[in-house]
Amino acid sequence: FVPIFTHSELQKIREKERNKGQ
């Protein structure tokens, strides 16, 4: 697996997932 996402991108995606969970 090659991390094509930057750390900031990952943070954004994670926040989106968290919002979806709520």
From Swiss-Prot:
Keywords: Hormone, Secreted. Pfam families: Motilin_ghrelin. It comes from the Eukaryota. InterPro entries: Motilin_ghrelin. One of its GO terms (cellular component) is extracellular region. Residues 1-22 are annotated as: Disordered. Residues 9-22 have a biased composition (Basic and acidic residues). GO terms for molecular function: hormone activity. Belongs to the motilin family. Plays an important role in the regulation of interdigestive gastrointestinal motility and indirectly causes rhythmic contraction of duodenal and colonic smooth muscle. This is Motilin. It comes from Canis lupus familiaris (Dog).
